[in-house]
Amino acid sequence: MISSIDHLIIAVKDINEAEENYRKIFGMEPVWKGEHKALGTANVIFNFKNTYCELLSANGDGLGAALVNGAIEEQGDGLVGVVYGTNNIEESFSTLKKFGYLVKEPIPRVVCRGEQ
């Protein structure tokens, strides 16, 4: 069902400080810096051979900002999401739904490695 870990999401209070710290830890520059304006978040992405790490901070109002702020309030900076890849989205959706997980209808997309 799950074929890969697409990426990890780490909630951070200060995106600039976190970027500098993770730059030192990973020994590389980020490949992307941006915003999800509708979600109220800013992000920085570090790319690896088979996955990527997304630093995510609140910078406005929205569902993403609420997630980040809630996670930081509860646990401090840290892991808030593991995004999985699958070779069969319909099968994965059906299996997760069968086991009682609340899941949205699948939205196929092309990931950073050019796969769908």
Describe every region a protein language model picked out:
Residues 4-13, 44-49, 54, 67-116:
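Vicinal oxygen chelate
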Residues 1-33, 39:
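Short, extreme N-terminal leader segments that mark the start of a protein/domain
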Residues 58, 85-87, 108:
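Beta-hairpin (beta-strand-turn-beta-strand) motif
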